[in-house]
């Protein structure tokens, strides 16, 4: 699961050694520190419970382990704390991060456009959206 929010960018996966936990990875030290701080504030976790680990040989250099329950509570809090109508504007300000996030936005826009073309010509097996 990829998550982009004001705390940063995270990739969360089930911990390979303990399926009750989630390994949350980040590419930037600032992001994993923001997450660690948020977890400590919102979930009364001790420092050692949310201490980021530096893994220079890993695909993601920064990691921490939390229970699936705590990760779910964090995501729920992030959703409930939404107070903006444009994510890109809400995180604007760091040129390297702006560029990276715009790259993700652009890649997914291109993906959407290619799907739209396929749907127009009946070549997509993508189901119709369920809008209510």
Can you name each region flagged by the protein language model?
Residues 1-132:
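Structured alpha/beta or helical-core interaction and ligand-binding surfaces enriched in interleaved
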């Amino acid at each position: 699961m990829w998550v982009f929010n004001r705390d940063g960018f995270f990739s969360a996966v089930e911990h390979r050694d303990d399926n009750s936990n989630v390994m949350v990875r980040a590419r930037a030290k600032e992001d994993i520190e923001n997450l660690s701080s948020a977890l400590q504030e919102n979930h009364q976790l001790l420092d050692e419970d949310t201490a980021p680990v530096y893994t220079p040989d890993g695909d993601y250099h920064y990691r921490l382990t939390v229970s699936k329950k705590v990760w779910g509570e964090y995501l729920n809090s992030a959703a409930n704390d939404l107070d903006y109508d444009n994510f890109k504007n809400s995180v604007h300000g760091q040129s390297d991060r702006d560029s990276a996030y715009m790259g993700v936005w652009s890649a997914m826009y291109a993906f959407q456009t290619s799907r739209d073309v396929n749907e127009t010509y009946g070549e997509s097996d993508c189901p119709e959206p369920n809008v209510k």
